[in-house]
Amino acid sequence: MDAEALRFPAPYAPHRALMRAFDACPMIAILRGVAPDEAAAHGAALYEAGFRVVEVPLNSPDPFDSIAALRAALPADAIVGAGTVLRAEYVDEVVRAGGELIVMPHADGDVVRRAKTLGIGCAPGVATPTEAFAALANGADVLKMFPAEQLGTQAVKAWRAVIDARVPLVPVGGITPENMGPYLAAGANGFGLGSALYAPGQTPAVTAARAQAFVNGWRIARKGAAR
């Protein structure tokens, strides 16, 4: 049996634009609660700091309007998507708004398959190896390890031993600029960043400062993990 068959339940063909964005900066900015009239300014602050992936959770005010505003404002190399996507029918609405990425707190196969049918990226939330491999079988591009605080770095290390290195492992939940290093050393490839990066009502200047702190923290952590 070849190594590919051991590592993948289905051929791995990740979304190319998403992988390019991850190569540039493997951190997903989560703008939970952002309003449509504020989205573009916060997106610009994130992009200027180096971020290339931004999601608007669907439990935000008028999320599809915010996705459309971000897509219109940001350069083509930025990936704009939706988070907290719970049902497959929402994927179509995300695409109509200009979204290119579906992020989920769970690993519903119908949602993952719908995203892949429509040609956009998908990062399902997984908390066990069983969920992780099922998500890959359905076509997941990225595995969102959630909640990271509960899973911890030992889970990252164990998963990395059995999940092909091409698949990004992205811890989400409780990530700060200071605690990325141990996750990277364990085998994580990126992060999803929530309230430590953005909270409703903060100014774009605050978003810019927090984004830069995360980018700096990422660079320091990456150097430490490479030693």
Model regions and ranges:
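Conserved N-terminal beta1-alpha1 strand-loop-helix module at the mouth
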Residues: 2-100, 107, 117, 177-178, ...
